[in-house]
Amino acid sequence: MQIVYSKEQLVDYVFRSAEATNDHPILIDQFIENAFEFDVDALCDGHEVFIGGIMQHIEEAGVHSGDSSCVIPPYEVSDAVKKEIETITAKLALELKVVGLINLQFAVKDDKVYVLEVNPRSSRTCLLYTSPSPRDSFR
């Protein structure tokens, strides 16, 4: 893996790398610096979506979720961004025809929401919604 900051660095890296083929492609991702990362676990029955909550990672986006800590409720996000995260979560769960749990990871920078991952399954963060909460989030 290589992080590059300019077109020139990218071209240089590609030429120095092994030959790209269908079996060994070069994958390019945009790295969003100084962004906040959020985790959402939701439950969908195919018609309605229940969002257990939004967790904010303490570390900047880019730290693997298994190596990061998070807090509920999120502390560095506007109500408009929270609403957008909830809307995207519901739309994706319904469009993907999820029946059961779904986990989504988002990055937010300058109030712009980026979808990082969508996992049509439970995640390790799912239990965190029920542990500190007086309500049974996913019952």
Features from the language model and the residues they span:
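ATP-dependent carboxylate/phosphate-activation module, predominantly the ATP-grasp catalytic core
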Residues: 5, 44-88, 122-131
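Single conserved hydrophobic/aromatic residue that forms the stacking wall/gate
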Residues: 129-139
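Conserved beta-strand positions that form and line the central face of beta-propeller blades
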Residues: 3, 27, 137
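Conserved metal-phosphate-binding beta-hairpin within the catalytic cores
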Residues: 28-30, 38-44, 52, 97-126
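A long amphipathic alpha-helix within ATP-dependent nucleotide-binding catalytic cores
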Residues: 13-31, 42, 70-108
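Rossmann-like NAD(P)H-binding beta-loop-alpha module
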Residues: 1-2, 9, 31-48
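Hydrophobic pocket-lining residues within nucleotide cofactor-binding pockets
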Residues: 32, 58, 134
